């Protein structure tokens, strides 16, 4: 029961940090733009929803590994990730280019 509370707390903190990035930082939403940001070495952190298709997920992880960028697997589906971003559409993956006022890049250890 304590573990569930801890995951909920971290989930909420990730959501609040994401909201801060959306307000003050630079980011790209979507598969194609995430790959573009990785190819041009602009992305600092990649966040992927847990229902992202396996082939797409592995391709993003591969590009992130080449660019030495952290990948965070978001604990929620693409609808949840879209809501956390403050959007009214689904978001499968997003790339944080500039965190702005948020400390999301330091706080989330990328799963290398």
UniProtKB/Swiss-Prot annotation:
Signal peptide residues on this chain, from the entry's feature table: none
One Gene Ontology cellular component annotation held by this UniProt entry: ribosome
Keywords: Ribonucleoprotein, Ribosomal protein
Lineage top rank: taxon: Eukaryota
Disulphide-bonded residues: none
SUPFAM superfamilies (alphabetical): L30e-like
MF terms in GO: RNA binding
Entry-linked Pfam families: Ribosomal_L7Ae
Protein family according to the UniProt entry: Belongs to the eukaryotic ribosomal protein eL30 family.
NCBIfam families attached to this UniProt entry: PRK01018.1
Name of the protein: Large ribosomal subunit protein eL30
Organism encoding this protein: Euphorbia esula (Leafy spurge)
Gene that this polypeptide is encoded by: RPL30
């Amino acid at each position: 029961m304590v573990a569930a509370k801890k995951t909920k707390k971290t989930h909420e903190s990730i959501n609040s940090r994401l909201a801060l990035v959306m307000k003050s930082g630079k980011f790209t939403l979507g598969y194609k733009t995430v790959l573009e940001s990785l190819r041009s070495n602009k992305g600092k952190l990649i966040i992927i929803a847990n229902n992202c298709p396996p082939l797409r997920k592995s391709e993003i992880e591969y590009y992130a590994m080449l660019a030495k960028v952290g990948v965070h697997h978001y604990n929620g589906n693409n609808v949840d990730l879209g809501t956390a971003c403050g959007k009214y559409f689904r978001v499968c993956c997003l790339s944080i280019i500039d965190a702005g006022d948020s400390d999301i890049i330091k706080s989330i250890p990328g799963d290398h």
